[in-house]
Structure formats: C-alpha cells, structure tokens
C-alpha cells in the first residue's frame, strides 16, 4: 500500500504542556517508576513473595517509595494482621480490611484538591471488586484519572495485588502502567497477558518467562511505558535480547 501525506497549515502547532502530576522524583531508583502516578499490578500465588515485595517497596526505611507519599490508604484483609504491623501508624480512616463502594468513595473524596501525593494499596481484594459493578466502575474511573485525583500539585498511585492476572476485571487491569508477575503455570493467565500486552513472537515471550522464573521467588517486571525491547526485567534487572515486534508498530 502506498501512503502519502500532505503537510497541514503551518499555523497548526502542537506543543507540550507540563503537569505537576508528572514531576520526576529521581531519588527513586530505576527501573521503578519515578513519576508518582503509576498503577502497579502485582500477580502471584500465595507464598510467591508479593506481600514481601510491597513491604520492601513501601515500608523499608529510606528505600524506594518509603516517605515519598503524603498519605497511604490500605485496603487489605491481611496486611494489618502481620506481627510487626508495618502500617500500624496510619490513621484509622486510611486502613480498611475490605473494599466497598463507601470506603473507597470516601477516600477518593478526601484527597480531592489536596495537592498531595497519594498511594492506594489494594491487597487481595479482588473478590470485593467482583461483588459489585459499582466498585469496578468507580475504581476503573479512578485509575484512568489517577494523575488528577488529588488536584494541582498532587498525584495518585496504585499498587493492586492479585493471585491471578485475569481475575482482575479487564477494564481495570488494562489501565496498569507496570506489571509484576511471579512464576505461574496458568496457561490462560499467560495467554491473557500475551494477548493484551506483548508484541513479541509468542515463543520469544515464553523464553523470557522461562529465563525470569529460574528461582522460586523471582518475577518478571514489565514496564508498559517502554518499547517492546526495553520493557522486560528479571526482578528489576533490565533484559537485553534479540527479537522482533510482531505488529510492526
């Protein structure tokens, strides 16, 4: 097919506008997101290590995302039952053992126009999501608009965990900016990830998974914002490989 283009009127000029929600925090180590409006989806079976990963990312003093947020909201039936209570100092209204339309809407309302940097942790509440279409709709809307939920100067990030990637409703999981996947033998889960996110030949993707899952608690980290040959990491180590973009895009 031959494609030609005719230049537009030179008066049409599109330039970039800067948003405070896109400010870069270069004290956060790469390849973790340095712009605090990310949505990280962490997928792993019980015992895979996903809870330990979250605690290391958020609670480890002086590391990674520790002290990077003005407020942290936790929705989890299990994180608050740990012996050392890693989120024990959070105000009562920021901690919930389940996810409901009321407590999530209240949290969203409380951050509006605050200009604060906010983190939501939704740990093992997939069943709560699936109980109510209203929750799914509200959560999906919040995720799509997360850059602006806290108003000018603010930003909102989400970390959501699930035992299986495709147990998260599609409109929600498709807004993720970063995916962490622990070892899985669930063919449907892998196929869904491949169909939705991956443009490599399937056999190459399986080779990458095999390389990443060589030890029990290893994971593959996928940065959706990167090009097809830069998006894959074994744990947080950048992978280099020879492959092609199947779509040509």
Where are the predicted features?
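N-terminal pre-Walker A segment at the start of P-loop NTPase domains
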Residues: 1-29
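Residue-level signal for well-ordered alpha-helical segments
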Residues: 19, 31-34, 156-158
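Conserved P-loop NTPase motor cores
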Residues: 40-62, 67, 77-81, 96-203
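An amphipathic, basic-hydrophobic helix/alpha-beta surface used to engage anionic
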Residues: 72
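Alpha-helix initiation/capping motif
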Residues: 80-83, 100, 223, 237
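Short, aromatic/basic amphipathic alpha-helical patches
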Residues: 83-93
